[in-house]
Design a protein with these regions (language model features):
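Bacterial N-terminal signal peptides that target proteins for export
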Residues: 1-8
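Cleavable N-terminal signal peptides
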Residues: 10-11, 21
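Sec/Tat signal peptide C-region and signal peptidase I cleavage site
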Residues: 17-23
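Beta-strand-enriched cores of mature, soluble protein domains
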Residues: 23-170
């Protein structure tokens, strides 16, 4: 009986070591991305060609003064946003224009009035629906996943993205 008890205890200990508990946390988020894109007060630009950059605030995660979007990095109308936080952690987000690439719309009677500072067309303001997919991260955000949706509002040489969704952290 003692040998059986030792064998069972050994097997249970081996199973516990082989399958550690994986606690994941899923939380809702709201994000705001602010990117100067043009206009007399927006130049010279500090962003590399083919990118947009600025700040990001993501509820439950934090604020960043260092976020960069690489346009068309995953296909036409599919962009990759990298948000770097003060502690060095990063969050990588795929953003897809909806219903198609750069499908900005100008509401109401705004037509071609106003300067937006971006080659999306005339009309102030312009709106673009987007879908986000959290692709991963580094540091405290390593293994992050999730996604959401929202709208980019482009007016007066500034793009402001507002999104919400859920993020899962391991």
């Amino acid at each position: 009986m003692t040998k059986l008890g030792i064998a069972l205890a050994t097997a249970a200990a081996a199973f516990a070591v082989a399958t550690p508990a994986m606690a994941q946390t899923t939380i809702p988020y709201q994000a705001t991305y602010v990117e100067p894109v043009g206009g007399p007060n927006g130049s010279p630009f500090s962003c590399a060609p083919g990118t947009s950059c600025g700040s990001a605030s993501i509820s439950g995660i934090g604020h960043s003064d260092n976020q960069v979007v690489q346009f068309n990095a995953c296909g036409f109308g599919c962009h990759v946003r990298t948000v770097t936080f003060a502690d060095g952690a990063t969050l990588v987000i795929r953003t897809e224009d909806q219903p198609s690439g750069f499908a900005f719309t100008s509401p109401g009677n705004s037509g071609s009035n106003g300067y937006i500072g971006f080659p999306a067309g005339d009309g102030n303001p312009q709106f673009l629906d987007i879908k986000e997919t959290i692709m991963g991260g580094t540091g405290r955000l390593a293994g992050a996943s999730g996604g959401g949706a929202g709208t980019v509002k482009l007016h007066g040489g500034v793009a402001i993205g507002s999104t919400s969704g859920t993020i899962t952290l391991p």
